[in-house]
């Protein structure tokens, strides 16, 4: 019987173990998409205790706590202490067997805290609390200290076009920081004209860009100024959260002006008008990314804020989102083609939340590859509800069957937590075990030189090359 979480965790044969320990584990981390706070990195935040760094803002854990029947006051309550929330988590973890949270929890205790032989639960919580808090009080366990311990080379944060990026500039000017922290352009509030806050947001964009927006070309000018600002601060990637993938042929500027004018006047737009405006903005933005050498990321298929009562109480991104089931293939094909037809499709990474769409994306990327760019269009790693063992395996296997796994840019945390870098370890173990199993079964050559290059490329090298502006 295997022992839980040894050094060979998830590695089932000698080939897998060699690939992981010798080649994957030493590679740096290139975390090109996350939701870390740039201010916390700039300020080198020190965490008061394990409960704070572990549970603050972690909606994965919050969902598990709710499923275990824990009172909301012990999850997000403002008046509840970090220790009380931590103990609620300690009582919940033994109930998460079979959920990736059980693996992640113990991986996060192993690295960076060095707790390797103790199962986390109510009986061990007090001892672990004390051990971890002692370490969190040292400089090696500040925000940047943890990143350095985990061998992080680069992180890409997620930033709104109106953001000042002052903390990115502060980080770039600090010679003591040897980790690149690059902003990523997230313009969701610009192209989602149907949202209630769209008009108010345009007012903020006007102020940030110093451009009055009454026509579509005004919007282009405002966005161009903000794109220039992001570029000056080291941005080379964009990201778009797309719940409903719409497409309509882009109308002329007169029609776009009319659509924008109706919305600014408070009138209700038709579904066609929403699709026309959304498509126009996304296609125009895509062409700007291509001209700048940026990567375009599309995260497709979440259904957000399902629980109205809790949304009113806590707001977005608090654990009440799930997988949508809208059809995406036709609209995605037309959207990408609208940029490619003029040879202005940027490097693109596609992520789907519904695993039903894995093969859709795995085959879609082959339609739009470009000469001179290996893996120009990528099928991104298992996202959100899919960044667990089965989800990662599905994505890896389907990409390998329908594309080129060797060109894959690999894993990202997509996380708000400084302890989530162990997800790269989790991914790397799964990747090495998959390749090791194929080699053991005679499906691919047991060629250490060939396989080690592939592992190192997927773990780091491909992403570093892909996100470099040439």
Swiss-Prot record:
Keywords: Isomerase
Name of the featured protein: Uronate isomerase
One of the GO BP terms on file: D-glucuronate catabolic process
UniProt xrefs under InterPro entries: Metal_Hydrolase, Uronate_isomerase
Organism: Salmonella paratyphi A (strain AKU_12601)
NCBIfam families assigned: PRK02925.1 (NF002794)
EC number: 5.3.1.12
Catalytic activity: D-glucuronate = D-fructuronate; aldehydo-D-galacturonate = keto-D-tagaturonate
């Amino acid at each position: 019987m295997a022992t839980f979480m040894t050094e060979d965790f998830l590695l089932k044969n000698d080939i897998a173990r060699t690939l992981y320990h010798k080649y994957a584990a030493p590679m740096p981390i290139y975390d090109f998409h996350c939701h870390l706070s740039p201010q916390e990195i700039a300020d080198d935040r020190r965490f008061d205790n394990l409960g704070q760094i572990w549970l603050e803002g972690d909606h994965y854990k919050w969902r598990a706590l709710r499923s275990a029947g824990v009172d909301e006051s012990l999850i997000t309550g403002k008046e509840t202490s970090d220790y009380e929330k931590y103990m609620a988590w300690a009582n919940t973890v033994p109930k998460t067997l079979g959920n990736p949270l059980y693996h992640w929890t113990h991986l996060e205790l192993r690295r960076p805290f060095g707790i390797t032989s103790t199962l986390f639960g109510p009986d061990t919580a007090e001892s672990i609390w004390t051990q971890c808090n002692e370490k969190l009080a040292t400089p090696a366990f500040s925000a940047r200290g943890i990143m350095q311990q985990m061998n992080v080379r680069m992180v890409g944060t997620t930033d709104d076009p109106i953001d000042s990026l002052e903390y990115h500039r502060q980080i770039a000017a600090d010679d003591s920081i040897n980790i690149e922290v690059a902003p990523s352009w997230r313009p969701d509030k610009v192209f989602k004209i149907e949202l209630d806050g769209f008009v108010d947001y345009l007012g903020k964009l006007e102020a940030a860009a110093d451009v009055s927006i009454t026509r579509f070309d005004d919007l282009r000018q405002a966005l161009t100024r903000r794109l220039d600002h992001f570029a000056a601060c080291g941005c080379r990637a964009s990201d778009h959260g797309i719940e409903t993938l719409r497409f309509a042929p882009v109308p002329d500027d007169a029609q776009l002006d009319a659509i924008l004018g109706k919305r600014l006047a408070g009138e209700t737009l038709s579904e066609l008008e929403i699709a026309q405006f959304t498509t126009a903005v996304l296609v125009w933005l895509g062409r700007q990314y291509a001209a700048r050498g940026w990567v375009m990321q599309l995260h497709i298929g979440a259904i957000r804020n399902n629980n109205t009562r809790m949304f009113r109480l806590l707001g977005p991104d608090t654990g009440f989102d799930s997988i949508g089931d809208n059809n995406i293939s036709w609209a995605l094909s037309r959207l990408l083609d609208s940029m490619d037809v003029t040879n202005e499709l940027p490097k693109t990474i596609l992520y789907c939340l519904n695993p039903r769409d894995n093969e859709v994306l795995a085959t879609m990327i082959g339609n739009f590859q470009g000469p001179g760019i290996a893996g120009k269009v990528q099928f991104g790693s298992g996202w959100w509800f899919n960044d667990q063992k089965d989800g990662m395996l599905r994505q890896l296997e389907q990409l390998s069957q329908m594309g080129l796994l060797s060109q894959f840019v690999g894993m990202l945390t997509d996380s708000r937590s400084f302890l989530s870098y162990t997800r790269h370890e989790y991914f790397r173990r799964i990747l090495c075990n998959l390749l090791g199993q194929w080699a053991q079964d005679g499906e691919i050559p047991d060629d250490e030189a060939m396989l080690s290059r592939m592992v190192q490329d997927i773990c780091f090298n491909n992403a570093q090359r892909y996100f470099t502006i040439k």
